[in-house]
UniProtKB/Swiss-Prot annotation:
It comes from Yersinia pestis. NCBIfam families: sfsA. It comes from the Bacteria. GO terms for molecular function: DNA binding. InterPro entries: SfsA, SfsA_C, SfsA_N. This is Sugar fermentation stimulation protein homolog. Belongs to the SfsA family.
Length: 245
């Protein structure tokens, strides 16, 4: 488990703005402006009135020492809005041998430069007796009609990552797109064709070329975050739609 130390503190969300900032009010009535480590649309994750949980940094150089970590929605779901946690969570689960699909490697390297488009891979797994495994981690928090979608906004960077992963397979390596589902209401995952059609098309192409797509849910609470169960990826309906066109 990734434990929050010191413990997170609750507050009520007033407004998220300028992408990286949010105004909150603590239970004691103190108004704070905190940092939001999420560049996405955060649809359904930032409703005014939601309870949010924040961490506090001891770095004296930070202008906004508090960071928004979790949202507890008014419908009872928990969401990790700090996208920087996704890589940390997947790396921790791999090191603890909790993900069977990614077990058996001796070394884990982070943020390694690679590819034809000047990219950095989130995690690179290596072992003497197997192919290098390139892992791109994506945080999934968009819940619509009982399904989790990625991305929540058009992502040219995400499109590039899919091309790079496909090229890794062509070059004889193993490539994995890992969807870290950080919303407790999400029970299945699909590409957000209605938001970023090109990303969805590239995802289908990448999987057909041999890129593995793995989706896992996580248990979330103010105490910490822990790997839960594997979740299904829905591509059949999209493939049917593509073929019809």
């Amino acid at each position: 488990m990734l434990q929050f130390t010191p413990p997170l503190q609750p507050a009520t969300l007033i407004l998220r703005y300028k992408r990286f900032l949010a105004d909150i009010v603590t239970p004691a009535g103190e108004a704070l402006t905190i940092h939001c480590a999420n560049t996405g649309a955060m649809t359904g994750c930032a409703t005014p009135g939601d309870t949010i949980w924040y961490s506090t940094s001891d770095n004296p150089k930070r202008k906004y020492p508090q960071s928004w970590e979790l949202t507890q929605t008014q419908t009872g779901d928990w969401i990790c809005v700090n996208t920087m946690r996704a890589n940390e969570l997947v790396n921790l689960a791999i090191e603890k041998n909790q993900i069977a699909e990614l077990s058996g490697y001796n070394f884990v390297r982070k943020e390694v430069k690679y590819g034809e488009e000047n990219s950095r891979i989130d995690l690179l797994l290596q072992a003497e007796d197997r192919r290098d495994c390139y892992i791109e981690v994506k945080s999934v928090t968009l819940l619509q009609q009982q399904c989790g979608y990625f991305p929540d906004a058009v992502t040219l960077r995400g499109q590039k990552h899919l091309r790079e992963l496909q090229n890794r397979v062509v070059n004889g390596h193993r490539a994995v797109l890992f969807f870290a589902v950080l919303h407790t209401g999400i029970k299945q995952v699909a590409p957000a064709r209605h938001i970023d059609r090109r990303y969805a098309e590239l995802l289908v192409q990448a999987q057909q070329a041999g890129v593995e797509v793995i989706c896992y849910g996580f248990q979330l609470s103010p105490d910490g975050i822990e790997l839960n169960t594997r979740l299904p990826l829905l591509l059949d309906e999209m493939l049917s739609s593509e073929n019809a066109e």
